[in-house]
Design a protein with these regions (language model features):
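Active-site core segment of subtilase-fold serine proteases
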Residues: 2-101, 105
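Generic beta-sheet signal
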Residues: 48, 161-164, 169-171, 190-193, ...
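Glycine-rich, phosphate-binding/catalytic loops in enzymes
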Residues: 61-66, 156-158, 186-187, 206
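Subtilisin-like peptidase catalytic core
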Residues: 77-147, 250, 264-266
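Extracellular S/T/G-rich loop segment that most often corresponds to the catalytic His/Ser-adjacent loop
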Residues: 179-248, 252
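An often Trp-containing, charged/polar helix-loop segment at the C-terminal end
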Residues: 252-274
Length: 274
């Protein structure tokens, strides 16, 4: 990809621009305390995307699959449990990242995007409402909408997720444009911080809270293949993997505490006295 194609939000995570942030005084090293030895067992993860290829060597078994479809004769949407292929490859990429990091997690595919990687905001809302009602532990949203009409319903849903115990991990737009639900305080918003091996970073200035590897990363892709890609979507998958590991090792942590643990594990975290 060219420089012009790279995520604009990444500039927040240039090492020279990172400011130290006060973090919880957790046991050191924080990463070892937070997710060391965890494999994601017992954590239910929903990937809301283009579908996930069941049986891909980097994904393994898809434990459940639903699609959002139109209700005949109206504008309503319904969620139907049904196996489906990945129509693009994007969802498989996210799922493969999560499963590689947390191989024992329970993984669900929630299909809302089509073969052009486009979908309707109403389908996203229906999918999120279902995922919240099903009380998933982690929901990855490497997609968004900029439609102002969807601001309020999405904010309400993300608040329901937050207070109901579901951690929503959302990729910010790849260009400087406000989209939802990544802009809400109730979610964990993520942008690319660089190539593989780039450290987790925390940004004190909104809207992109966390930076994670998302530049020239090799990911699972449709038809059993792989692809080298760049984008905030893939950074969100990485953070969803971390959140899955944290929730497996510390199952009692509510969403706000999970975000605090991530911030404490960031490369620019500064310890404060208790």
């Amino acid at each position: 990809m060219t420089e012009q194609d790279r995520p604009a939000w990444s500039e927040f995570f240039v090492p020279s621009r990172l400011r130290p942030v006060a973090a919880l005084p957790l046991p050191q090293p924080v990463a070892e305390w937070a997710w060391g030895g965890s494999d994601g067992a017992g954590v239910r993860v929903a990937v809301v995307d283009s579908g996930v290829e069941d049986g891909h060597r980097l994904v393994g078994r898809v434990d459940g699959a639903v699609v959002v479809e139109d209700v005949e004769g109206g504008d309503d949407k319904r969620v139907v449990e049904r196996a489906h292929p990945d129509l693009y490859g994007h969802g498989t990429a996210i799922a493969g990242t999560i499963r590689t990091m947390a191989p024992a997690c329970e993984l669900w595919s929630v299909q809302v995007l089509g073969p052009s990687l486009k979908g309707r905001a109403a389908s996203l809302v229906a999918a999120l409402r279902w995922a919240v009602q099903q009380r998933f532990d982690v929901v990855n949203l490497s997609l968004s909408t900029g439609g102002s009409a969807w601001f309020a319903p999405l904010q309400d849903l993300m608040d329901d997720a937050f207070f109901g115990g579901t951690v929503a991990v959302c990729a910010v737009n790849n260009v400087f444009s406000a989209t939802f639900p990544a802009q809400f305080a109730s979610v964990i918003s993520v942008a690319s911080s660089g190539p593989p091996g780039s450290p987790l970073a925390y940004n004190v200035d909104p809207p992109a809270e966390f930076g994670a590897p998302g530049e020239d990363v090799t990911v699972a892709w449709r038809d059993g293949g792989t692809a080298t890609v760049t984008g905030n979507s893939f950074s969100a998958g990485y953070v969803s993997g971390l959140v899955t590991l944290i929730r497996a090792k510390h199952p009692g942590l509510p969403p706000f505490a999970v975000k605090s643990v991530l911030a404490a594990a960031a490369v620019n975290a500064a310890r404060v006295s208790p």
